[in-house]
Amino acid sequence: WVPVLRYSEVLLTKAEALANLGTGVDADAVALINAVRARSSAAPVAPLTKDALIAAVLKERRIELAFEGQGEFEFLRTGRNIPAHSVVAEQAYGSDYVVLPIPKSEMDMNMKLIQNHGY
């Protein structure tokens, strides 16, 4: 397994950071979102508030990074609940069972490890 970081993900991560740092709409963040959208000939976005800008970044990440296995990490990173799926109930942010347990073999080899809460 080799982790791959696409350029669009880098741009969207920077846009999200800029959006979260400011108190209003950051022009650089909007430009980064629109750079990603321009690659696929999508219409540019022009959010009017900080919340709308953050929502636009998260939506674009969902579209751009679909099916790449990053959904759960997105929810954990942004502090949002993980939505329910066909056979799995919604998991609240901070729930004991959102993060998997550390394998016992790893715990046995490193006595300084602390098991994740709930296991």
Set out the residue ranges of the language-model regions.
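Acidic/polar-rich alpha-helix caps and helix-coil junctions
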Residues: 1-119
